[in-house]
Amino acid sequence: MTKCEFYREGERITGFSVSGHSGYAEAGSDIVCAAISAAVSLAEATINDVCGAKAKVRVKEADARVTLTLPASCEEEDTVQAVLAGMMVYLIDLRDQYPDYIEVLEV
C-alpha cells in the first residue's frame, strides 16, 4: 500500500510524503503506482520549476519515499497551496477508487 501524508500548520499545507508500493500489479504494470507517481512529479515540478518555491525534495529509494517540504514562505503561496490542495483531492479520489492500495492522511 502507498501511504500519502500531507502536513499542515493551521490552514497551510507545508508539504507531503509519499511512500511504499501500491501492490496493485507488478512493477511496470501498476496503474495505481503510475497515477501516484505522476501526481507527485507534476506537483513538484509545478511548485519548484513553475512557481519557483524552492521546496526541499528528498528521495529515499530504500523505502520508495518522496518528501517535499515548503519553505516558511513562498512568493507564489496561493498558487502553491492550490497545487497541493489539488494533489490531495486527486489522491483522495484515487483512494476512493482503489482503497486497498492507497492511504491518504492529513497530519
Sequence positions of predicted segments:
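Short, conserved glycine- and acidic-residue-centered signature motifs
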Residues: 32-36
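N-terminal intrinsically disordered, cationic/polar leader segments
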Residues: 1-31, 41, 45-107
